Amino acid sequence: MPPQPRKRFGQHWLKNEKVLHRILAAAEVTKGDRILEIGPGTGILTRWLTSLADAVVAVEIDRDLCQQLRRQFEAVEQFLLLEGDILQLDLAASLSQQPDFWPLNKVVANIPYYITAPILEKLLGRVAQPNPQPFDQIVLLIQREVADRLYAQPGSKIFGALSVRVQYLAGCELICPVPAKAFQPPPKVESAVVRLRPRPFLPAAINPPLFEQLVQLGFSSRRKMLRNNLQDLIDREQLISLLTSLKVLPTARAEDLSVEQWVRLSNKIQEMRGNDG
């Protein structure tokens, strides 16, 4: 009996060929690519990736699926399976002695929705500590609600701290929505394919930890104005003066500022602290 999807691993296996081809087209897979696939499941996407790329490294936590994948791809030289938790795995340590599979330059994955945020941090890093070996691009099948937040624009009610942090590190675009019926079993939510292109040159936050703290505080109470949310970090009148210099209204809320404005505000606060010191 073939392995069945396990709820505890958040497994929903893609069965729609049209969506599969949209993912492959978005990833722009060519010879020369070395692909990381997270959660290959039954190998439906893996088969295509191994036919198009020079190398595919699949990370799977489910032991039963690993046994099936080893049998299925044992004759495929460009395929390597790593059994384990992607969040705990040190890819560089695991692959650095295998030049045919390292370094990896793209990610293509249908990931478990309940660990989307940790996986994004694993792949992109954080503002204060970006991935030192960024991927060329990352194509993910994720929950639609999260996808919308990733590429949301300033002024939108869903533009939040996650939007700012991810857009600081990467460009993000929606490729296509994916209905629940495209999976086995169907999830209780709608899904979407997104493409992230990590930025080769990051926005110049002088003090990245301060930037992260500022964004987190700014969005801590969405209904409040920034001058209230940030009062523990900076004097209210000083903040109003800084916002005015950035051509931002004193009544602005966190979602009103673009990523660039968040960077400039962070830098001005850092400069002010330096001058005070």
Question: Which stretches of residues belong to each language-model region?
Answer:
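Active-site-proximal catalytic alpha-helix in oxidoreductases
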Residues: 220
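Short helix-coil junctions and helix-kink-helix linkers
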Residues: 231-233
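Catalytic cores of RNA-modifying enzymes
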Residues: 1-216, 244, 255, 264, ...
